[in-house]
Amino acid sequence: MILFQRIILQRLNQATADDLLKYSKQYGISLTRSQAVEVANLLYGKNVNIFNESERMRLLKQVETITSKETAQTVNELFKQFTS
């Protein structure tokens, strides 16, 4: 795994609710504080590899249950920007 991927994964796996809210505003993703807390709890320390499509899709299904289908799709587009 290249350094760039490791940095992205480390940052994602340590993201706080405040981090997620900041990113949501930066990238135009609709996210409430309570949703950010739930998603941060989902991500924190789980070592989810967004560069692996099956892991990313599993994570997005969980994000969809917390937020909405539209938000999960937007997050997927954001992940695609990071992984391409």
Swiss-Prot record:
Any Pfam family the entry gives: DUF2624
InterPro entries: DUF2624 (IPR020277)
Source organism, top-level taxon: Bacteria
Protein's name in the database: Uncharacterized protein YqfT
Gene name linked to the record: yqfT
